[in-house]
Regions:
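Internal/C-terminal transmembrane anchor helices
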Residues: 234-249, 410-440
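Flexible juxtamembrane loops connecting transmembrane helices in multi-pass membrane enzymes
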Residues: 148-149, 214-218, 241-280, 297-298, ...
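C-terminal luminal/periplasmic domains and tails of membrane-associated envelope-modifying transferases
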Residues: 444-642
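TM-adjacent membrane-interface loops and short helices in multi-pass inner/ER membrane proteins
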Residues: 269-309, 315-318, 322-329
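Alpha-helical transmembrane segments of multi-pass inner-membrane proteins
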Residues: 2-32, 43-54, 75-84, 95-252, ...
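Flexible interhelical linker loops that connect adjacent transmembrane helices
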Residues: 181, 399-415
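Short, hydrophobic transmembrane alpha-helix segments
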Residues: 28-40, 57-62, 88
């Protein structure tokens, strides 16, 4: 009876924890940056998981392991929190604290959950099914839609990294099934088919970093497992991988073309060189977590045609954003995991199944860490969550073999049973309410943008006001509100001087607030410059100088702001300085831009000035681009089948 009670007591925790993790993972897969609502839902569910685990621990307490890996992870997360104090845009850094810190949060949630074996079996099975679904999506995108394989991710590289994290632990379980004579015969066959699909999908992405990480990690898995398993299982696993690679070459062939070009990857080299120049500006304490994309533009090489959001090297980017201590602590986490593996594998009494599973989990983490030298896995929420879970399982197995000491925190000695749930709920309400506000504010912000496009100025004004009340430190809302008021001034009749002045002053207040909470956003100064430029009577005698200075500051922060550059050139042109105006435009023309109709005024003005100043061939090049964009805009048609 005592045993039955013990098991029954642990079951609700396991079921709830598994459910909350999986429910949190699904919106995380859809979060790519702007979709803050998905991020908020994920974090709320993780906070609920934390609350559930803590609430169950009043009598038994929480067992905190005393290991180097747990310590390094905690110190890394603590440093991320400390770095918020000097961030140049704290509201963005706080979001990234939870974003990047999901690795540590999920690790601790797994570690503190009572029955971790059951939690792992539930979560791992669903993650494997999810991996198959995403793999099939990627294959469909390539073979049928003739697109890059990326499933729900923004890039094929992150899609491949996610599949690597699933495939390598699954490979370890496949080896165990092949060696287990008591396992049903169809189990190894089914898992073998799953692995073939995963490998095929990874190779189909033609991601060089993911492919090399897979090869490296698989080599480690095979090397460390060969002595303890029948060779038949290892050979079958390698044949599955080779068959998937050959199938990819026959059906697609892009990976074979891209792999030899790895040493000539000039695109990433350009990004790394520019990022290194940014690093030298603040190497010790960093610029603030999540602010790379805002600080990068002034250092950006014009030939860099990337989105500019990431350094494509997590270790370099975390150094830039959190300083040298952040990098050292991240590396300490990796070395602590490696040292834990070495120590555990030296235990001679360890079972074969634990040894192979432990190695497979480590190899999954190794693949993610290896690819992070050329990518940005640390900033992919779903990958960080699964990495935290895998690291938690790896840590659990190692501790079980090493019998490491732990510290038990007993809340019952400090807080009564009735007061405990009230205190826990109140404490967790703080982050939960923050995430609710974050998600709602972004929804109102998106709603305001739609309303503004539809000409509903008053409705957009109300939506932005609500968003600002929810997140007062988000500069996006403030900039959008200022721009809305700038536009509203143009809609008023000429004799409405009083209303224009009120809107003008309020717009300046919004811009002042935006500049205060985020000094890196160049768009703030573009809107300010336009406000001065369009309202000379309200700007005063020095309005022209104010507008000019605003545009200069905008371009100093982000030289690719071509709309602000066009406005700046127009001001200079009004004074008859064609050479200077063209020079301003030419500076912007050094950069690569995605084709969009918004570029037409920029290219048209530059082409006009080039022709007037005798640069006929250069003008013709831009005129051809304008014609192409105009033709593309005119030809755009949204089909409807209903």
């Amino acid at each position: 009876m005592a045993v039955i009670k013990s098991k029954t007591h642990s079951l609700p925790t396991v079921h709830v924890s598994s459910l909350l993790f999986i429910c949190a993972l699904f919106p995380a897969l859809l979060f790519k940056g702007p979709q803050i609502e998905f991020f908020a839902v994920t974090q709320i569910l993780l906070v609920m998981w934390l609350g559930w685990v803590v609430l169950q621990s009043h009598g038994s307490g929480l067992s905190v392991p005393k290991t180097a890996l747990a310590l390094c992870l905690t110190l890394f997360w603590l440093w991320l929190a400390i770095s918020l104090s000097w961030s140049l845009a704290p509201s963005i850094s706080v979001i990234n604290f939870w974003w990047v810190g999901s690795l540590v949060l999920v690790f601790w949630l797994y570690t503190l959950t009572p029955d971790r074996d059951a939690l792992w079996s539930h979560a791992a099975a669903i993650i494997l099914v999810l991996g198959i679904v995403l793999a099939l999506m990627g294959i469909y995108q390539v073979l049928v839609l003739e697109q890059q394989a990326r499933s729900v991710f923004e890039t094929r590289n992150t899609h491949a990294a996610f599949l690597n994290l699933v495939a390598l632990p699954a490979s370890a379980y496949f080896l165990l099934l092949m060696a287990d004579k008591g396992a049903p015969r169809h189990f190894p066959g089914l898992l073998g088919v799953v692995l073939y699909i995963l490998f095929f999908a990874i190779f189909m992405t033609a991601s060089r970093g993911a492919t090399l990480s897979l090869f490296l990690s698989m080599s480690v898995l095979v090397a460390l497992s060969m002595r303890y398993l029948p060779k038949r299982g290892v050979v079958v696993l390698l044949l599955l991988m080779a068959a998937a690679f050959l199938s990819t070459e026959i059906s697609h062939g892009e990976l074979g073309e891209r792999l030899p070009q790895l040493a000539q990857d000039s695109a990433r080299r350009v990004i790394w060189e520019s990022s290194w120049n940014l690093l030298k500006a603040s190497p010790w304490q960093g610029i603030g977590l999540g602010l790379f994309y805002l600080a990068y533009p002034p250092y950006r090489n014009p030939v860099d045609n990337s989105g500019g959001f990431f350094a494509h090297n997590d270790y370099l980017q975390i150094w830039i954003e959190t300083g040298l201590p952040g990098l050292l602590l991240l590396l300490a986490v990796l070395f602590a995991a490696l040292w834990l593996l070495v120590r555990t594998l030296s235990v001679k009494t360890m079972s074969k199944s634990t040894r192979i599973e432990l190695t497979g989990l480590f190899c999954g983490l190794l693949a993610v860490a290896g690819q992070s030298f050329v990518d940005f896995n640390l900033y992919i929420l779903s990958i960080m969550m699964i990495s935290g879970l895998v690291m938690g399982r790896f840590h659990q197995l190692a501790n079980r073999e090493l019998k490491t000491a732990s510290m038990r925190i007993r809340f019952s000695r400090l807080i009564g049973k009735q007061a405990f749930p009230v205190i826990v709920v109140l404490l967790l309400l703080l982050p939960a309410m923050y995430f609710v506000s974050l998600g709602l504010a972004n929804s109102y912000y998106d709603k305001a943008l739609v309303q503004a496009r539809e000409g509903k100025v008053q409705e957009a004004d109300k939506s932005l006001a609500t968003a600002e009340r929810l997140t007062p430190a988000d500069d996006r809302m403030l900039i959008a509100h200022a721009d809305l008021y700038r536009h509203a001034i143009t809609l008023l009749p000429p004799d409405a001087e009083g209303s224009k002045k009120l809107l003008y002053e309020d717009a300046l207040k919004f811009l002042d607030q935006a500049q205060h909470v985020n000094s890196l956003r160049g768009l703030t100064f573009v809107i300010r410059g336009r406000l001065y430029q369009q309202n000379p009577a309200l700007a005063g005698d020095n309005g022209h100088e104010l507008a000019t200075d605003s545009f200069r500051r905008a371009l100093a922060l982000n030289p690719k702001l071509f709309q602000g550059r066009t406005d700046y050139a127009a001001i200079v042109l009004q004074r008859g300085k064609k050479d200077e105006a063209l020079q301003i435009l030419d500076e912007g023309l050094k950069y690569e831009y995605y084709n969009m109709s918004d570029l037409i005024p920029f290219y048209s003005l530059a082409a006009k000035l080039r022709r007037e100043l005798g640069r006929e061939e250069d003008a013709k090049t831009l005129e051809d681009k304008v014609q192409y964009l105009e033709k593309q805009a005119a030809a755009s048609y949204y089909l409807r089948g209903y």
